[in-house]
Swiss-Prot record:
Belongs to the RbfA family. Pfam families: RBFA (PF02033). This is Ribosome-binding factor A. One of several proteins that assist in the late maturation steps of the functional core of the 30S ribosomal subunit. Associates with free 30S ribosomal subunits (but not with 30S subunits that are part of 70S ribosomes or polysomes). Required for efficient processing of 16S rRNA. May interact with the 5'-terminal helix region of 16S rRNA.
Amino acid sequence: MADPARARRLAKRITTIVASAIEYEIKDPGLVGVTITDAKVTADLHDATVYYTVMGPTLDDEPDYAAAAAALERAKGVLRTKVGAGTGVRFTPTLTFTRDVTSDTVHRMDELLARARAADADLARVRVGAKPAGEADPYRDRGSADEPSDAGGLVIRTSDGLEAENTGDDYQAED
């Protein structure tokens, strides 16, 4: 088993080699618009999974994922040879190409966030014209407004209908 740091370094080197080979050396029309995003290498350094994305001819066109996958399968042997020559490891890892769905997930999350923002905006528009259902202060007794007494406290009506004076002394020390 190799050191995890060594596996990460090898994966980064494989990403660079494969991306450079696709961009400058392999002339396959199916690889136009293919971008290598990441690579993962197993702990024994024998297998590498290379992640890729595909861009369409224009921003509005859907990319041809099947053609890109077929082109990568055709170029797999050449790419593995270039990885073996460029890495200098004893055993050249086998390459497996997997479409990177991170950008699709990001796009989906952006759509969900936009939908949530629109729902929040609708709720804010409804909230502007809304009135409370009932009194603004439902706990205030309208019949007996709290008035100051002669002693400076507030007169409070209890549940029995009796009046009591609130002197503000909620805490009284015991002797």
